Amino acid sequence: MSDALIATSSEAPQSPAEQYDPTRKQKSADKTARIPIKIVPAEKLKKPDWIRVKAATGSSRFYEIKDILRANNLVTVCEEASCPNIGECFGKGTATFMIMGDKCTRRCPFCDVGHGRPDPLDVNEPGNLARTIAQLKLNYVVITSVDRDDLRDGGAQHYVDCISQTRELSPATRIEVLVPDFRGRLDKALDILQACPPDVMNHNMETVPRLYKQARPGADYEHSLKLLQEFKRRNPNVPTKSGLMVGLGETDEEILEVMRDMRAHDIDMLTIGQYLAPSNHHLPVLRYVHPDTFKMFEEEAYKMGFTHAAVGAMVRSSYHADQQAHQAGFA
């Protein structure tokens, strides 16, 4: 475990003012206040010159996209997870839609999505999503979600409803899904998804197995590999995809070993990007990976047989997902 972390076996009693309020929008420290890991602020590393975020321009579609999303009661992971690429993506008229609410049942200390008791599923969401995608005239969309451990199918049927209704209104649109791990309900979820599979199936491994306890509490490395392999077995013509972050304390060799595991489990596409801490209340960045190292990861990925590898400091799993799929020959 990193020196920047202290594991806690129980949470201290909260004062009335600190009690969890499911109706209040979580911000900053609220998002990590109830995780099982205590984050002790570490010395902040200076960002290197190669970490550059593109801001939205006045002539871009940034505010238009935000207005359309709010009008249709939709959430994007771009906003909820404080993605550094939001200005560029919204500016180009693209977004990764996040379904099933903005509260996750998991408590991963690298993630800026709020944690808490989720709201009931919005039965109108699949229709709202489909109409928004049609309104934006998108050729390629990514649909992701929070973890919903409170649902018997983990939200698999809601994914299928979103996919099917989107295809009804936009039959030419390619759909990539970035799904949770469906832990405890894997077979049920895969049975449901098989009725209406996406065009690309994505589930992020996130980090190396040694760091799962501190970075992905509640998740299991082998289970995530099994999810993608089993989906591929059932849907051999649908490409599978997964992503990793670097900068959490892993070594280069550990990243390469995960990449080998991915190929051994029939994962086709890969993304690797630099972890950037959303705030001082999240896991700290323990290293900034040099562009030469990213280049090495990319070269090794193609040697291993990945059909496409998007590797670089600002790469995220859904960043330029349409271009990734096109370059891999899937879109």
Curated annotation (Swiss-Prot):
Residues engaged in binding [4Fe-4S] cluster 1: 78, 83, 89, 318
Pathway: Protein modification; protein lipoylation via endogenous pathway; protein N(6)-(lipoyl)lysine from octanoyl-[acyl-carrier-protein]: step 2/2
Pfam family membership, one: Radical_SAM
UniProt keyword list: 4Fe-4S, Cytoplasm, Iron, Iron-sulfur, Metal-binding, S-adenosyl-L-methionine, Transferase
Start and end residues of each stretch annotated as Disordered: 1-33
Compositionally biased residues, Polar residues: 7-17
SUPFAM superfamilies (alphabetical): Radical SAM enzymes
Cofactor: binding details: Binds 2 [4Fe-4S] clusters per subunit. One cluster is coordinated with 3 cysteines and an exchangeable S-adenosyl-L-methionine.
InterPro entries hit by this protein: Aldolase_TIM, Elp3/MiaA/NifB-like_rSAM, LIAS_N, Lipoyl_synth, rSAM
Cofactor: [4Fe-4S] cluster
Domain Radical SAM core: 89-307
Listed name of the protein: Lipoyl synthase
Organism: Cupriavidus necator (strain ATCC 17699 / DSM 428 / KCTC 22496 / NCIMB 10442 / H16 / Stanier 337)
